[in-house]
Amino acid sequence: MSELHSLLTFPVRPISEEHYLGELSRFLKAGIPATYTLEQVAAFERSELREDADEVSDEEEQSNTTPLHILARSLPGNLSDDEEQVVLHMMDMLFEYGAGWNFIDFENKTVGDLILERNGGNRESPLYQRVVEAGVSAELLLRKLNGGDVEFIDENEIDICAEASAEVVPKDALDDSTGKVSSVSDDDATAADPDTYLNTKLKYTEDALITENNKDGVMMDWETDIMKLAADTLVSRKPVGESVVLNIGFGMGIIDTFIQERNPKKHYICEAHPDVLKKMKNDGWYQKPNVVILEGKWQDSLNKLLDEGNVFFDGIYYDTFSEHYEDMLDLYDIVVGLVNPEGVFSFFNGLGADRPLCYDVYKKIVEVDVATYGMNCEYTYVDLKGKLPDWKDVKRSYYNCEYYYHPKISFA
C-alpha cells in the first residue's frame, strides 16, 4: 500500500483539514494519480522484487481498487459533521485530479456501494450524493466530448452500469465514436441490437417473455406492480373514459391490460416483433374497439403520426427491449410533439439498474435531459425488497436494485 493509500485509511482522528487536506494535495501535486490502484501498487512491488509481473490473477486484472475505494472502505462509523466536511473536501480533490466514479474494486464493489454499506444504506447522505454528482458530471462531459453522441460508460466500466436496454452490452459491442452497436457475439447480439432482436424467435412462458434460444429476459411478471402504477399515471390527466394513451412495446401485455381496465377513449399500442404481434392477434387485441395497433418500429410509426399532426396523447409509455439511452433521447424529440401540454410521459426505468450507484446517476441524467425540453421528471419510489425473481430461468438478471424509481415526466 502506498503512502497515498495509507493516508486515506484515516489513521489519525479527528479527521481534520490540517492533517489530511495538505498531505493529500501534496501527493496529488507530486504526480501520484488519483486513480492509482492497489493492483498497480502490487504489480510495481512484484517488479521491484524481480518477480514475474505478468503473473496477475484474474481478479487483479479486472479490479481497480482506487484511492476513493480506500477512503470509502475506511470511513469511521462515528463520523462527525465536521469530519464529514473534511472527507467531502478530500473527495472533491480526488475528483478534481481525475478520480473515477464507477470503478470496481477487488470485492466487485463501487465507491458508492462501500459508502452505502458504511452509512446504513442512506442514499441521501452527502458522501454518497457526492459520488452521484461526480457520475452525472462525468457522463455528461463524456457525451459532450463525443460531439453529442451518447456513449455513457467508458472502457472497463461497461459491465458495471447498463444503459436503457435490459441487458448489459459488452464493451466490444460499442462503436467508439457513437456508442451504437456495431458488432457483438452471437450470445449477446439479441440483447444488444434491435434488428437482431426483431429477427429472433420469442417464447412466452407462464411468467415471462424470453428469447427462445438465449433465454434473454424480455419481460417478466415481477414487473406487474410497476406496470399497474404506470397505467394509473397514463390515465391520471383526464376523467375516466377520456384518456388517449400510447404504449410503446407490448411485451406480455401487462400494462396494456391495466390500461384497458381503466377504459381509455383510445389506446394505441406500438409493437414491432412479429411473434408478439401474432400473440396480440390470437389474444384478441386487434378486435378491441378502442385499440389501435401500430405495427413496426416506433421510429417509423410515431414519426408518421407526428407528420400527420392529428393525434395527441394524454399519456405515453415506453418499454422496449434491446434499445439504449441514445434511443430514448431520440424518443424525447418525438414525445414533446405528441404529448398534450397537460399530458405525461413515462417509461420502464431500468437505466443503470445493475448497481444502485449507476441507477441513481441515471436518475439524475434523465432529469437533466428532459429539462432541456422544458419538462420536469418526478419519481415515485417503489420498494422491491423480496419481489425480484431468482432469475434462474433467464440468461442473466436485468434488474439488481431493491427499489425502483417510477418516472413521471410532464411539461413544467
UniProtKB/Swiss-Prot annotation:
Instruction: Classify the main location.
Output: cytoplasm
Q: Where does S-adenosyl-L-methionine bind?
A: Y197, M227, F250, G251, M252, G253, I254, I255, E271, A272, H273, W298, Q299, D319
Q: Which InterPro entries match?
A: Arginine_N-MeTrfase_2, RMT2/GAMT_Mtase, RMT2_dom, SAM-dependent_MTases_sf
Tell me the keywords, alphabetical order: Cytoplasm, Methyltransferase, Nucleus, S-adenosyl-L-methionine, Transferase
Subcellular localization, per the record?
A: Cytoplasm; Nucleus
Is Isomerase there in the keyword field?
no
The keyword Nucleotidyltransferase is assigned to this record = no
Query: Residues in domain RMT2?
Result: 190-412
Q: Which GO terms describe its cellular component?
A: cytoplasm; nucleus
Can you name one GO molecular function term for this protein? protein arginine N5-methyltransferase activity
Q: What does the entry give for GO biological process?
A: methylation
Give the E.C. number(s).
Answer: 2.1.1.-
- Give a short account of what the protein does: S-adenosyl-L-methionine-dependent protein-arginine N-methyltransferase that methylates the delta-nitrogen atom of arginine residues to form N5-methylarginine (type IV) in target proteins. Monomethylates ribosomal protein L12.
Q: What does the sequence similarity comment in the record state about its family?
A: Belongs to the class I-like SAM-binding methyltransferase superfamily. RMT2 methyltransferase family.
Q: How does it assemble?
A: Monomer.
UniProt-recorded name of the protein: Protein arginine N-methyltransferase 2
The record lists the organism as Candida glabrata (strain ATCC 2001 / BCRC 20586 / JCM 3761 / NBRC 0622 / NRRL Y-65 / CBS 138) (Yeast)
List the taxonomic lineage.
Eukaryota, Fungi, Dikarya, Ascomycota, Saccharomycotina
Q: Which gene encodes it?
A: RMT2
